[in-house]
């Protein structure tokens, strides 16, 4: 059995390491995610239905129903969602990932990222920027207006530029950003700048969106976290390439919906193993405390699943203070500790100040259970009430219960063959 597992893990690692994510389009979700039809919304994390959703996610669902035009008021939207008239599905089941509440609706534009090695695609919404945003559960008229601007103005300009460029290779940008101090979860300053540098010439050359070009460029340069969603889609395309390999103990997804935390492993495909989401530990913005916080949420842990975020914190000194990690020595300790539960180091994503060693990559279910070391995740902290927004940033841990469940299921699966 061990040989089978080792061979399976090597195959999964090869698929993950060889993934070549390229931004090939920016399109309405329903145009590229054909199963996302009328009456369906996607959300972050493992499956969860309306009654069990946390307040920020319920707020985002209400906002998406208004944005989509399926409800005219918050009351109508809440009645639709609570009455079962809307199908609420996990974004992961559609090869998609979304930050925080992670809500997708059919009209929302998405980044289309293709793994050119195997041909699979992954999707993520466009980052809304700062302030009052749907990913934290806000749903008033200003939020809807911004989403419609993204749909009608920003997305068409980006689509035209991406198609004119023939696609944007993301892996080289991510490698360079990592060398410049981003861990690509809570810090994307370099990655966003590099992306803008790559796309700007194509935005300004013959764009049909010339009248709104200044708005588009102002939005891009004013949002240091813009690249987050691109990094998430890139990571999803790599992890999906490593999924559904018989015998593999590689963790292919970690995700949270604000109520439950879920993981998937290579050998068991799309099956979720869940436990209650834990509270992040970190720093709170002035006026807020842990009493205001919602349990951990979002699909952005796909970055740690690949080896970025908290796993790469040794290469991102600037993020240490923001997430309350302590000193640089503490950040180094996080990266080294994560190396104890991974199968290798990513050959294309390296940390310069660790002699260009690759980030620890490929979380091994067996090592997590054997060591008792839980994967660490850099994360934003959402207010527990919809619409109040982000109240801090910190580090969350994956609940070990998920991994014990998965190992037991894997043993039962292999013994039954």
Regions found by a protein language model. Give the residues of each.
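Anaerobic metallocofactor- and corrinoid-dependent redox/one-carbon enzyme cores
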Residues: 1-417
